[in-house]
Amino acid sequence: ISFDIDGTLEVGDPPGCITMDMVRRAKDLGFIIGSCSDRTVTNQRNIWRTHDIEVEFTVLKHQLELVKEQFDASEYNHIGDTNIDQQYAERAGFTFFLPDQSLQNFWPSAE
């Protein structure tokens, strides 16, 4: 699961509905997790480090296809809050979810 930050994660600006505990749960369930944002890679890594979450990738939005090249998975998902997020996700072959839509798909008990 690739996460946008702003408007998606609770630590974003603006904050989104995906909590860091939900990200941890996804990782515990075996998902490959990371972020794809217009924030710098250094800033993305600092966010994850601050919250003690080890991610497998941090990329800029236009580099999402590199994640697909790097990891062999049965499905590729990106959670973001804008049309731009959706455009980059679909261009890279990822299924796109808005944050509130992702709740029922990845965290059904969180609704």
Where are these regions (language model features)?
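Short hydrophobic beta-strand segments
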Residues: 1-2, 78
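Alpha-helical substrate-recognition element adjacent to the catalytic core
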Residues: 2-62
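Short secondary-structure boundary/hinge segments and terminal tails
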Residues: 44, 66, 106-108
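Short polybasic/polar patches that bind polyanions
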Residues: 49, 69, 90
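Short loop/turn motifs at secondary-structure junctions
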Residues: 54, 72-75, 93
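Output/docking surface of receiver
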Residues: 56-63, 97-103
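Conserved Lys-Pro-Asp/Glu-containing loop-to-beta segment of HAD-superfamily phosphomonoesterases
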Residues: 60-84
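Acidic, Mg2+-coordinating phosphoryl-transfer loop and its flanking beta/alpha structural elements
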Residues: 77-111
